Amino acid sequence: MKPFIVAFLLSLACFAQDAKQAPKIFEIPTADVYTRYRYIDTNAGTVTADDLQYRFTGRFRVNVPKTGTYFGSRVETGSSIGSSWSNTGIGRSKSEWTLNAKTFFIGQQLGKQAAIEVGAMDMEQGAGTEATYADVDTWTEGYRLRLNGEGKYLPSKFTATFGFIGDFNTPNAFGRLYRLGEINYAQVLAEKKLTKTIRASAEYDRLRGIDLFRAATKMSLPDSWWINDLQVENVVRVAPRATSGWALNLVKSKNRLGWLNPGIYYSHLPTGVYKDGAQQALLNGDVYGTGKRIGFTTKYQATKALDFSTLITRKLDSDPGFRWRAQIVARYQAAPLLKQLQRALTSR
């Protein structure tokens, strides 16, 4: 299987002569700086987290002129696959100062609507969230084919990924690239914009011998409704030991209450969905965890670059994991400022 995948991707690269030239050599899609206060306790009432944390997430891309070739990387704080945050030392935990290139990959455009990528990459979520799938901080080392286009019966986006998921405590991508020779994960995902207000995706995943199907829908509702954004998703473990989970997220983002973006979500992800023996083969979003949970969120956009958000969530069953979790987050999006600085320097 592995030699076939490599040969397939390399053969596609031979058709890259018509690739569209990238307009810029160096791009900064994301440069977000965060700080948050986080509280977590367990069923017994034991406090496990009561800390002030910081985070940096930067996404960078270098385009090789006239070739369609590009390099991408996510540089981030955090020391494990399920966390992009580090402790300041204020609170219960000791300070930690970590910054790693968590992803690093090379891509090749194949005309206007296709690309292949090889390396340590982010996961593809489709129209769903990390409530029922991989934490957004998760990485995979492998190979990916991307197809994009608009057609009445064709998906707006299609990806096929073959890779390795593991090394949960190795945040440096260069310490994991040797896994390119191992395949324990495959995902085939199709996403479609059905109407101006509805987007849906469906996917098949195979991870360590576990077969899964996942579907998600995201809808924008009329401004006058009590709910303006609706997102529902479902994941089914087909074999072995079949089980399933789902999540629903509702947000009021328009009119009088829109300035605060109040939201409510419910998630139910049994521990067994991603369990391989005694281990979790995949970690979903840490703010959701496993089991039955309800959560309440808000988000206030102070300026174009600065926003504040809150979350409080409670476990509704006896599933292992945290009971209460609460956090207050401040985020500053520095990418526009860095782009202005970049333009000023290159215009001289």
Kindly give the residue locations of the regions a language model identified.
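Sec-dependent N-terminal signal peptides
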Residues: P3-A13
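Beta-barrel outer-membrane channel/assembly domains of diderm bacteria
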Residues: A16-I116, L145-K152, T298, F308-K315, ...
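Signature for the C-terminal beta-barrel architecture of outer-membrane proteins
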Residues: A19-D32, Y39, T46-Q53, G68-Y70, ...
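Flexible, surface-exposed loop regions and adjacent strand-edge segments
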Residues: T48-Y54, T88-K94, Y133-T138, G175-G181, ...
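Outer-membrane beta-barrel and related beta-rich outer-membrane complex signature
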Residues: W85-N87, E130, T170-F174, D276-A278, ...
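Outer membrane beta-barrel transmembrane domains
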Residues: I90-R92, A200-E203, I227-N234, V251, ...
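Residues on the solvent-exposed faces and adjacent turns
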Residues: A120
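A glycine-rich, basic-preceded beta-loop-alpha segment at the flavin cofactor/substrate interface
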Residues: M123
